Amino acid sequence: MSVKKKLFIETLGCAMNVRDSEHIIAELSQKENYEVTNIIEDADLILINTCSVREKPVHKLFSEVGTYEKAKKKGAKIGVCGCTASHLGSEVFKRAPYVDFVLGARNISKITTALNTPKFVSVDINHDESEYAFGDFRSSPYKSFVNIMIGCDKKCTYCIVPQTRGDEISIPKDIILKEVRKAASSGAKEIFLLGQNVNNYGKRFSGTHEKIDFSDLLNLISEVDGVERIRFTSPHPLHMDDKFLKEFSTNPKICKSMHMPLQSGSNEILKAMKRGYTKEWFLDRALKLREICSDVTISTDIIVAFPGESDRDFADTMSVVESIKFEQMFSFKYSSRPLTPAASMTNQVNSDIASRRLSTLQARHTEILDEIVKAQKNSIHEVYFEELRANSSVAGRTFNNFLVQTNGSEELLGKILKVKITDPKRMVLYGQII
């Protein structure tokens, strides 16, 4: 039996990148005899699967790749994949000439070709359905990430994703259901559906396929034997119609946590961002969700200091935060991305003002979070345990996405058990199994 080669892979960015990395691992394992290592010095191949949503991950790429070049063993190859690869293409070689190949986010199915072709570059965006068929690998035996669509049509003025991942294309339901059945039959109780705008699923396919919407897809997945929990990211506020909210609130297998990316609470800024909805629409959908699904948790994304944002615009964002009281918030200062309309807007906000606004927003959300967490004391949740932690403890998620940790061993992994919360903290709720 031949000796397996070693693969070191670093994944930056979103859950879709995590799933892409899983596909890469499977392809290299099945076709090139690789296995994963966590030791860079042992690796025959070093891959960085990149993110380009903000500027910071791009800088991190070239910092990391330089470190890897110094640490790698003689003869090892370095590849750059993902969204930054899509954006920069062969420019990566100019900035890091020791990189051996570059694969865009829509080209990872070509990983074996790239590995065996000197200075290979592929960043084209096409709609070939053969690219949906990958080898199978899951980084967790307890849940499975499943892509249901690729690309994005929204063209938000600050976002580079449509340029790196292409137009929005839905993956045919038969392919999705086949992957779900396979994951569930191998023990994955939780299915995590991925897409840039999942609740716009079914609007466009690359070929002739049965037209179904996201609500119908959720229903079909919930009927698969072995599936006990369904999560998804990210839905778009524009497509949160009543049918979708009803399916979300009434389907007993859909986890009651919703990500609603606000970005801004100002109608003027939302218009400049080309988000497609108003503050009023967002509030209506979020408050309706709270009404029909009392145990729901809502998370959000917020960008402060988008070009042209005034004090009043920022106050509008703060007012939405006060109204909805998000259980989780991912907030950032606006990051200018090349080739996006917002990058050329003349009314950029001073960086000191941006920093103050972000601090104000995050400080208030911390206060809100403290109130939310405090209310969890003595509550009882069903927790799906997925992770071993230090000091003989295990961690998992509640049905509405709180992270819970309790005393326990490996035998609890993969089980759903009731836990009483005894010591709630901001980042994790500590409890006891009952």
Curated annotation (Swiss-Prot):
[4Fe-4S] cluster 2 binds at residues 152, 156, 159. Coiled coil: none annotated. SMART domains: Elp3. SUPFAM superfamilies: Radical SAM enzymes (SSF102114). Residues 5-120 form the MTTase N-terminal domain. Pfam families: Radical_SAM, TRAM, UPF0004. Residues 374-434 form the TRAM domain. [4Fe-4S] cluster 1 binds at residues 14, 51, 83. Its EC number is 2.8.4.3. It is an enzyme of class 2 (transferase). Belongs to the methylthiotransferase family. MiaB subfamily. Catalyzes the methylthiolation of N6-(dimethylallyl)adenosine (i(6)A), leading to the formation of 2-methylthio-N6-(dimethylallyl)adenosine (ms(2)i(6)A) at position 37 in tRNAs that read codons beginning with uridine. This is tRNA-2-methylthio-N(6)-dimethylallyladenosine synthase. It comes from Campylobacter fetus subsp. fetus (strain 82-40).
